[in-house]
Every structure is written in structure tokens, then in C-alpha cells.
Amino acid sequence: MKVTLFVTCLVDMFETNVGKATVEVLERLGCEIEFPEAQVCCGQPAYNSGHVEAAKEAMKHMIETFEDAEYIVTPSGSCATMFHEYPHVFKDDPKWAKRAQKVADKTYEFTQFIVDVLKVTDVGASLPGIATIHKSCHMTRMLGVTEAPGILLSNVKGLTVRELPNVQNCCGFGGTFSVKMTPISEQMVDEKVDSAMETGADYLIGADCGCLLNIGGRIERLGKEIKVMHIAEVLNSRS
């Protein structure tokens, strides 16, 4: 099975280990990975900031880059959601709306692809300790992926998963929201860190690097002892 990887900006610039783990897990599951070097940003930051025309240019480029893929997989619920929003963005342009729908229909978040397409629930990972899961807003509320991460983590050998209190609450990242509304964002991420600490977990695990960078940065500044990991890193662990 051929999988075309959309690596995302944050993985490319800050968390390359997540990209590596994503590839290694998928290859271990029998996938052949393709990586189009022409890929750029999905356009979400510009679109959410109101720069619609600039965002559309990036989106058109991404549609052209990925439309011939068999499956498109990304280690980000947020960016996968943006791909699924493309048809709505181009709803008044039939030509691009059709091409956008073609891309959206074969785009999957990493864990969603493993569980729903590959029909795998145990990837053979092992990681001793206690974990709690942060469920990102776009991934759960817009993409509708709520169960796949927990299903996969429940089968990681040695790992105990505890529910995160107030799991439905945003971590305060929200892309440019954390920059434009910093005091509010800081309060939100403080509450998220407090919730994570309540669980007594060794690891806070999520599927979006934006959230994890935000939460992890706050944990570091507060001097808390809990390790933040992307789920691809966990599923690639053989501890």
C-alpha cells in the first residue's frame, strides 16, 4: 500500500523525530512511503487569520501536489482537518472544489489511518509507565477522530493510560490564538498542565505537535516532571 506523507510545518521545523517515527511505524505495517518535496504549508494559519486569498494559493499548490496519491497520511489532526476543509473553502469554484474533494477523501490523520484503514490496533510497541492523552480540538471536534489514539495506546505493552480530567478543554494553542491572545492562552495551558499532573502520569501523549509544543513548553517553564510525547513516538517505542 502506497502512503503519501504530509509531514506538516511543525514536524518539519521543530519535531523531525515525529516524522521519522511516523515513517518507521507505517513501514513496519507494510506501507510504502512517498514524500513529495514540493509540499508546503496547508494554509491553515493564513486562513484562520483571515488571509483567505493567500491561503487559497497554498491550498491549490497542496491539491496539485497530493491529488494523485493513493492515501495521504499526516501526523496531525489539525492539518488533516484543514485538508478536509478544502472543499468548503473552494465551494464557489467548482473546478477546484472537485479537486479539493478528491484530496480530502483520501486524507487521514496518522492513528485514524492505522485503525480505520489498516485495521490494526496493536503495532507491537512497548513503553513502561503511566500515560494520559490530550485530545486536540480539531482532531476530535472537526475530524471526528476520538477513539483511535486510545485504542492504539491501550495495546502498548507496559503502558497504563489514565483519563485526563477536563479532556475536552482546549490547551490554549489554537495556532495564532496563542500569540494574539497570550494571557488567555497561558491560563488555558496552565489548566491543562494542572489536569495532566493530577493523573500522576509519566507521559502526556497527543497527536498534534502544536498542542504538544505549547503544553511541553509550559511544563518546562513550570519545572514539572512529565514527558510530552507525540503518539507516533510512542507507537515507535520498543523499550
Swiss-Prot record:
Disulfide bonds: none
One of the GO biological process terms: lactate metabolic process
InterPro entries named in the record: Cys_rich_dom, LutA
One GO cellular component, as annotated: cytosol
GO terms assigned for molecular function: oxidoreductase activity
Domain of life: Bacteria
Family classification: Belongs to the LutA/YkgE family.
Entry function: Is involved in L-lactate degradation and allows cells to grow with lactate as the sole carbon source.
Protein name per Swiss-Prot or TrEMBL: Lactate utilization protein A 1
Originating species: Bacillus anthracis
Gene that produces this protein: lutA1
